[in-house]
Amino acid sequence: MENDLEEAKNMKLLLCAFEQLSGLKINFHKSEMFCYGEARELGREYSQIFGCDIGTLPFRYLGIPMHHKKLRNSDGKTVEERFQKKLSGWKGKMLSVGGRLVLINSVLSNLSMFMLSFFEVPRGVLKRLDYYRSRFFWQSDGHKKKYRLTKWEVLCTPKNQGGLGILDLDLQNRCLLSKWVFKLISEDGIWQRLLRNKYLRHKTITQVEHMPGDSHFWSGLMKAKNDLLRMGKFKVGDGSQTRF
């Protein structure tokens, strides 16, 4: 939205109309708005119009810090705490190996899915999450140490290859980021046009590389694109998007 108080009032009317037509309620008291540039000087006026607070960066969404910097190992602490909270309520000693395997795949592995979907997650964070999953699988109660019969990497291989099919978080991270690369190439929406104008600039995805100053999200896409291009096929079509 442009830095215009009248436009802000019109936006508030549209949001109120949305509430009336949809029957849904927007909780403005729990919402935050962010002002940039000259709009910061009118932050108080915008806050009064929308009835919400003015937020500052970085902020957290689903436990993950939203900022322009690369994720650090400390940024995964919230997800670790969610792991610990889940594990503290489970009685591993009362569960069979199969029961613990089901909980790992259906619950623990999904707690970090939002972070894996949007960011290149540091290896240190992934190792910590694997530590909690491995400890629950082998030690059940997390206190008495037990000998591990095989490497964790073996357990994360598919069942038809001799593993247990436990989700490989590093591989899942790369696959989820590759999904955004595929959507960028194959679909045409607002966010696709934004990224194309900012980063591609009339080039194809194969011609651009990571550059200093790129956003953390785009840096993750640049690393994931190699996996996608290596396993994918490109349809030439009329040749307008093909580089030889």
Model-found features: residue ranges?
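A helix-boundary/hinge signal
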Residues: 1-244
